[in-house]
UniProtKB/Swiss-Prot annotation:
InterPro entries: PCF11-like, PCFS4-like, Znf_C2H2_type. Residues 70-80 have a biased composition (Low complexity). Forms a complex with cleavage and polyadenylation specificity factor (CPSF) subunits CLPS3, CLPS5, CPSF30, PCFS4, PCFS5, CSTF77 and FIPS3. Its main location: nucleus. PROSITE patterns: ZINC_FINGER_C2H2_1. A zinc finger (C2H2-type) spans 254-276. GO terms for molecular function: mRNA binding; RNA polymerase II complex binding; zinc ion binding. It is found in: Nucleus. The keyword Nucleus applies. Residues 1-80 are annotated as: Disordered. Pfam families: zf_PCFS4 (PF23228). This is Polyadenylation and cleavage factor homolog 1.
Length: 416
């Protein structure tokens, strides 16, 4: 089998020096480099020489596509396999081929395999696609689609790059389908058309919208003003607002179950409940004895009270009644403490207007006023120390003297 020019040159260089065998070049699985060298059968036996650098392609020719680093014109070169075995420029950078990428750097292009670092299977070598450099002001949408044509990429005859014209059209300039007249009409028909409503339905929708806006306005007004300050809607004042009640009585958590009064602490609440007990007991006692309930006292002392205190009329009898009771019990015994049952209507003295000292008597099982007596039969309660002193009978004959002595004492008691 005859060999090509590339292999013959290599064979002549190694003539009479190396015996070529199949195992010397394992990269080739037969074919051009896989035969026994018969022309050098008389060569002396030599040591086994290092395997020669393998060609990138089996045919031994230059790669089909490669770049020339001498200039920066981004021109791809196609090696011709015809008669003269020389490469010609076929595709220029300004041609209208679509690119595989938009990388303007040609140094990153796939380089041929080097000896010792080559492809383990040199028979299958990927062939790169031609590419060119894009202009910066050229958008991708304006580029037409590329229809590949194998006959124009690898011609079997040399063609000059300046006069290169493909046999078949390479590009198909198709307009944007969205700009087509038929497409525009279809899109306009598919758009949402306005709905035509009747007059009655339009009036109903407007009425509903007005009511909704009115409710929204009322809600905003009610939220802006506190509860109870807006009188536009009287029905809202009759509604029990728990939040408002809690805010008013948040600092008074305790409430009386009988009258509804509220208190801040437990001590005040306990005193109030004791008052209810005494009040109920006094009412029962009055009902049992057939007495009329006592009326509330006036703010000021009456004229009869002033005259009674000035003359010392019946007050002497009341005081002497208490004194006689003490004398009957015996002189050796200590005098009994004067006290009267507590009355919620008379908490202060009728003369000095000072509060009475209240305590609970276990003997009488009731709340009592300490050091207090009845001033008159009407039930006026005064302090013992505020009672006027009894006068002798001769003093009653001199009213002027009595007035001069007793009136200042009454005025002094009231001033206290």
């Amino acid at each position: 089998m005859a060999s090509n020019g590339s292999f013959s040159a290599q064979r002549n260089a190694n003539a009479r020096t190396t015996m070529k065998r199949r195992s010397d070049n394992r990269g080739y699985g037969g074919g051009i480099g896989g035969y026994q060298e018969e022309t050098n059968r008389y060569a002396p036996p030599q040591k086994r020489f290092r395997s020669q650098a393998q060609q990138q392609f089996r045919s031994g020719h230059n790669p089909l596509y490669h770049h020339h680093g001498s200039n920066n014109n981004n021109v791809s070169r196609v090696s011709s396999q015809s008669y003269n075995n020389c490469g010609v420029d076929v595709i220029a950078s300004n041609s209208s081929f679509a690119l595989r990428n938009n990388d303007s750097n040609t140094n990153n292009y796939q380089k041929p395999f080097v000896a010792g670092y080559g492809n383990p299977n040199p028979q299958i070598v990927p062939l790169p696609l031609p590419y060119r450099k894009l202009d910066d002001n050229l958008s991708l949408d304006s580029l037409p689609d590329w229809v590949p044509n194998s006959r124009t990429l690898t011609p079997n005859y040399p063609v000059r790059s300046s006069n290169f014209v493909p046999n078949t059209p390479v590009f198909t300039n198709v307009q944007n389908p969205m700009n087509h007249s038929n497409m525009v009409s279809v899109v306009s028909q598919s758009m949402h058309q306005p709905i035509v409503l009747s007059k009655e339905l339009t009036d109903l929708l407007s009425l509903l919208n007005n009511e909704k806006e009115k409710k929204t306005l009322e809600a905003s007004n009610s939220d802006s003003l506190p509860v109870g300050l807006s009188f536009d809607n009287p029905s809202s004042l009759n509604v029990r607002h728990e939040s408002v009640i809690k805010s008013l009585y948040s600092d008074m958590p305790r409430q009386c179950s009988s009258c509804g009064l509220r208190f801040k602490c437990q001590e005040e609440h306990s005193k109030h409940m004791d008052w209810h007990v005494r009040k109920n007991r006094s009412v029962k006692t009055t009902t049992r004895l057939g007495q009329q309930p006592k009326k509330s006292r006036g703010w000021l002392a009456s004229a009869s009270l002033w005259l009674c205190a000035a003359t010392g009329g019946e007050t002497v009898e009341v005081a002497s009644f208490g004194g006689e009771m003490q004398k009957k019990k015996g002189k050796d015994e200590e005098p009994k403490q004067l006290m009267v049952p507590a009355d919620e209507d008379q908490k202060n003295c009728a003369l000095c207007v000072e509060p009475f000292e209240e305590f609970f008597s276990h003997e009488d099982d009731d709340w009592m006023y300490k050091d207090a007596v009845y001033l008159t039969k009407n039930g006026r309660i005064v302090h013992v120390k505020c009672m006027p002193e009894p006068r002798p009978a001769k003093d009653l004959r001199e009213p002027s003297r009595v007035m001069s002595v007793t009136v200042p004492s009454v005025a002094k008691a009231i001033a206290c």
